[in-house]
């Protein structure tokens, strides 16, 4: 039974039992930036189990794409070396949300395994939680499993309810006993039944886990029965496929064998048992589906996990002798195997291939040098009897050659060498500190502050009647007073000035007190809740304790908030037009424009840009209210607010709803979408592999841009004596006229070449029966020189000829020798003789050669020596 059949039979079976077939969710968990990747079937139903989400069904079944790499769920180092570890796997599952419970879950599992998949009942063992008599009795008395094949597993992990057979989502919340089903491969395979000292052997393999969410656990550890118990089951597709296909390793199933053969084809390897081929076959699945779901190779978060997996695959290809990109070529083979079950993979085939190819090309530039250094270090270490690689070297490989630490560890592990992780971490932390120090705003570097926080009023107000100066800094040092002309930083107890944060530039404006005026050039954060107003005291004097009137530059703020609000609308529009793989990778919003970096692998087409503009401007025309609300982080993400993975959020966050966009954001925004006025994208380009950048303008900036564009359009129309509406067809007419004139010019040049040929032929000098000619043609291009050369060779029949022309201070040369004379005179040598005298060089065939030069003033003398040079040859 093929993998595809096993998957479809599972889903069809549970659909026949009243379950709704739910498509696999993304590998990037929706609205849960705390979870690196989806790693089980229940992730997309987490809120249903917690009671915070309701679905229109109470029974569900799915085949969930899952990844375990990075974070606490990390199988990376074992992949390729064991029979059942993978970075990517599919989890088959059936779920009950307060519908059926243990009896039906157990009976369904047994029916599927023994009736549909036709596994021998005598080969199946089960485990139950030691105190779960209900499940035990169902297995023994209703299903009929002999008691000798039912194993009770107690608290075997050091504390109450800490057991392989007791599941809990977290320290508190839904939990309950579970029952696992094992397949017995028979006495020919070493290993003992679950719960025995030999349980880690390969004879008894767990194939299905049935979790019974029966209790709610509080902070004191008290267990309270749930009013509506739930069921969550998971069966690894690769594991059950190995059992049904009568093989002991997941890598022997049909899907993996096809990918292993494809990897062998691209790496030119005949031995299909190479562990490196297994690594490559596993990794192409994880990498491809991560890219499908919007992850792009990068240096942090999910992007760095993807980069690590890609580079591990490349290293194993390199180990097999592959020195050029190969990994991306396996995407087509993966689509052939899994594209029908997951059409999103087939749809994204081109994008996935391009992203992987770009990452391969990047790493292949450095892998050879990096591996040479690592191999030399390991050889030296072995000679000295060492067992640990220097962490500083591992860091150098990471920093200079792009070797993730686990890749270096992978290479070392193959030679039974450890890596000094502590030294690696120390080097990494040292670099981070240096980068952090170098990146500090120079005015804020070293500022020491331990006073009160700044209270921000800028959401509602642009000026305050008074605010107190609570700290002053000049040249990075705290001072009591500031004198006219001095530049420094002022901290206020209250301010309407927005401090640079979240990609939004800090406010500008003034602080006034009597005749004292402090011009604020920028506002930044000295600490998380302490705002530094940086600028110059243009008049008067200020001291700590003085009261000032803060006034934000209203025009600049208005332009900034228009750009910021438009960014939110644009982000949503980009995801709508390009796909949900689009994720924010950086932004800068100021009064002039919004700059937005996002994950996408191809340049946007003109049509896509227009669609994004249309969507945003439609939101602007609807003129809907903007709403900001403070709420707990968990509630915010559950409400659908977009959060950025890797960002650190407080317990309470600000949710900004503008139009159809909903994001976590602490920035300042318009009151209504109509306040943005107008939105226009002015720049689209690439900034890194898989990262695009869009720049856009709004409001009066957009209007002025379009007015300038209109003025240029009118100017161009006037130059062509046309109305702006007639410009395109008029340009077409002009282009047609230009083409006609160019054609006529070519005809005239050809005619000129013919007439010049007749005249030049008469200038040829006879040298021992060979006609020799060296001449400069006025106004000729290279094509004309060639045509003239051909006519002269035909006319003179036996000849050695050099023709030259000068244009834009450069010399063009062509030498031609008739076939009867090439034994003595070579065109390449002849043209070089002339070219070297005019600052150039050239070459070509014995009968025709071309050259160029940069010193036209020396051309007459160079041509005058041709006859003598040919005479010496013949």
Curated annotation (Swiss-Prot):
Its main location: cytoplasm. SMART domains: tRNA_SAD (SM00863). It catalyses: tRNA(Ala) + L-alanine + ATP = L-alanyl-tRNA(Ala) + AMP + diphosphate. CDD domains: AlaRS_core (cd00673). It is found in: Cytoplasm. Keywords: Aminoacyl-tRNA synthetase, ATP-binding, Cytoplasm, Ligase, Metal-binding, Nucleotide-binding, Protein biosynthesis, RNA-binding, tRNA-binding, Zinc. One of its GO terms (cellular component) is cytosol. PROSITE patterns: AA_TRNA_LIGASE_II_ALA. Its cofactor is Zn(2+). Its EC number is 6.1.1.7. InterPro entries: aa-tRNA-synth_II/BPL/LPL, Ala-tRNA-lgiase_IIc, Ala-tRNA-ligase_IIc_anticod-bd, Ala-tRNA-synth_IIc_core, Ala-tRNA-synth_IIc_N, Ala-tRNA_ligase, Ala_tRNA_ligase_euk/bac, DHHA1_dom. SUPFAM superfamilies: Class II aaRS and biotin synthetases (SSF55681), Putative anticodon-binding domain of alanyl-tRNA synthetase (AlaRS) (SSF101353), ThrRS/AlaRS common domain (SSF55186), Translation proteins (SSF50447). GO terms for biological process: alanyl-tRNA aminoacylation; negative regulation of DNA-templated transcription. It is an enzyme of class 6 (ligase). Binds 1 zinc ion per subunit. Zn(2+) binds at residues 564, 568, 665, 669. The keyword Protein biosynthesis applies. One of its GO terms (molecular function) is alanine-tRNA ligase activity. The keyword Transferase does not apply. HAMAP family: Ala_tRNA_synth_B. Catalyzes the attachment of alanine to tRNA(Ala) in a two-step reaction: alanine is first activated by ATP to form Ala-AMP and then transferred to the acceptor end of tRNA(Ala). Also edits incorrectly charged Ser-tRNA(Ala) and Gly-tRNA(Ala) via its editing domain. Consists of three domains; the N-terminal catalytic domain, the editing domain and the C-terminal C-Ala domain. The editing domain removes incorrectly charged amino acids, while the C-Ala domain, along with tRNA(Ala), serves as a bridge to cooperatively bring together the editing and aminoacylation centers thus stimulating deacylation of misacylated tRNAs. This is Alanine--tRNA ligase. It comes from Cupriavidus pinatubonensis (strain JMP 134 / LMG 1197). The lineage of its organism: Bacteria, Pseudomonadati, Pseudomonadota, Betaproteobacteria, Burkholderiales.
């Amino acid at each position: 039974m093929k993998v595809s059949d096993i998957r479809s039979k599972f889903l069809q079976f549970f659909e026949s039992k009243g379950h709704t077939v739910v498509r696999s969710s993304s590998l990037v968990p929706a609205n849960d930036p705390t979870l690196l990747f989806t790693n089980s079937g229940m992730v997309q139903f987490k809120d249903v189990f917690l009671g915070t989400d309701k679905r229109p069904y109470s029974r569900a079944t799915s085949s969930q794409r899952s990844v375990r790499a990075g974070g606490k769920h990390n199988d990376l180092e074992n992949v390729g070396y064991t029979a059942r570890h993978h970075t990517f796997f599919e989890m088959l599952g059936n779920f009950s949300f307060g519908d059926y419970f243990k009896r039906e879950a157990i009976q369904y599992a047994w029916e599927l395994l023994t009736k549909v998949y036709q596994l021998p009942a005598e080969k199946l063992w089960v485990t139950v939680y030691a105190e779960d008599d209900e499940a035990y009795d169902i297995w023994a008395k209703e299903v009929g499993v002999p008691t000798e094949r039912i194993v009770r597993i107690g608290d075997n992990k050091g504390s109450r309810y800490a057991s392989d057979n007791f599941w809990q989502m977290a320290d508190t919340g839904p939990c309950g006993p579970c029952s696992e089903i094992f397949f017995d491969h028979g006495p020919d395979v070493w290993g003992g039944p679950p719960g025995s000292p030999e349980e880690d052997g390969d004879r008894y393999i767990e194939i299905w886990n049935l979790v019974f969410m029966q209790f709610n656990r509080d902070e004191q550890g008290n267990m309270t029965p749930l009013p509506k118990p739930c069921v969550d089951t998971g069966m690894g597709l690769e594991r059950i496929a190995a059992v049904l296909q009568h093989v002991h390793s997941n890598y022997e199933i049909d899907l993996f064998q096809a990918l292993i053969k494809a990897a062998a084809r691209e790496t030119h390897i005949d031995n299909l048992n190479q562990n490196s081929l297994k690594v490559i076959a596993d990794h192409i699945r994880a990498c491809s589906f991560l890219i499908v779901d919007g992850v792009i190779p990068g240096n942090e978060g999910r992007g760095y996990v993807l980069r690590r997996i890609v580079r591990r695959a490349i290293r194993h290809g390199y180990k097999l002798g592959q020195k050029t990109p190969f990994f991306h070529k396996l995407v087509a083979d993966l689509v052939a195997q899994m594209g029908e079950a997951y059409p999103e993979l087939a749809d994204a085939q081109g994008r996935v291939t391009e992203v992987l190819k770009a990452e391969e090309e990047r790493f292949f530039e450095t892998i050879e040098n990096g591996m040479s250094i690592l191999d030399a270090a390991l050889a030296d270490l072995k000679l000295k009897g060492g067992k640990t690689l220097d962490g500083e070297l591992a860091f150098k490989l990471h920093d200079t050659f792009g070797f993730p630490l686990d890749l270096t560890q992978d290479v070392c592990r193959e030679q039974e060498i450890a890596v000094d992780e502590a030294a690696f971490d120390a080097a990494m932390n040292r670099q981070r500190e240096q980068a952090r120090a170098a990146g500090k705003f120079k005015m804020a570097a070293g500022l020491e502050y331990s006073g009160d926080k700044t209270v921000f009023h800028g959401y509602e107000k642009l000026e305050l009647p008074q605010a107190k100066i609570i700290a002053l800094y000049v040249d990075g040092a705290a001072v009591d007073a500031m004198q006219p002309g001095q530049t420094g930083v002022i901290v206020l107890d209250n301010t309407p000035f927005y401090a640079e944060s979240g990609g939004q530039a800090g406010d500008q404006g003034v602080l006034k007190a009597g005749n004292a005026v402090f011009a604020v050039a920028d506002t930044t954060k000295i600490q998380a809740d302490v705002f530094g107003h940086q600028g110059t005291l243009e008049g008067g004097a200020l001291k700590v304790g003085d009261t000032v009137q803060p006034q934000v530059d209203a025009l600049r703020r208005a332009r900034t908030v228009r750009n910021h609000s438009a960014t939110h609308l644009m982000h949503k529009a980009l995801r709508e037009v390009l796909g949900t793989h689009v994720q924010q990778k950086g932004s800068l919003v100021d009064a002039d424009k919004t700059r937005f970096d996002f994950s996408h692998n191809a340049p946007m087409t003109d049509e896509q840009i227009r669609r994004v503009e249309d969507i945003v401007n439609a939101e602007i025309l609807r003129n809907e209210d903007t709403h900001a609300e403070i709420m707990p982080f968990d509630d915010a993400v559950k409400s659908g607010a977009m959060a950025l993975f890797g960002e650190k959020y407080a317990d309470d966050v600000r949710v900004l709803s503008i139009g159809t966009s909903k994001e976590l954001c602490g920035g300042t925004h318009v009151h209504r979408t109509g306040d943005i006025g107008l939105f226009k994208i002015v720049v689209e380009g690439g900034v890194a592999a898989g990262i695009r950048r869009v720049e856009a303008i709004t409001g009066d900036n957009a209007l002025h841009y379009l007015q300038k564009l209109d003025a240029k359009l009118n100017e161009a129309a006037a130059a062509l004596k046309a109305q702006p509406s007639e410009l395109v067809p008029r340009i077409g007419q002009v282009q047609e006229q230009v083409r006609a004139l160019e054609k006529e010019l070519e005809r005239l040049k050809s005619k000129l070449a013919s007439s010049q040929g007749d005249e030049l032929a008469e200038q040829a000098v006879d040298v021992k029966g060979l006609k020799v000619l060296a001449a400069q043609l006025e106004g000729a291009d290279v094509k004309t020189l060639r045509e003239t050369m051909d006519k002269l060779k035909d006319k003179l029949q036996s000849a050695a000829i050099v023709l030259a022309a000068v244009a834009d201070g450069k010399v063009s040369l062509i030498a031609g020798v008739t076939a009867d004379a090439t034994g003595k005179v070579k065109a390449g040598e002849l043209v070089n003789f002339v070219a070297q005298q005019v600052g150039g060089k050239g070459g070509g065939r014995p009968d025709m050669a071309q050259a160029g030069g940069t010193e036209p003033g020396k051309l007459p003398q160079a041509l005058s020596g041709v006859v003598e040079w040919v005479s010496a040859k013949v």
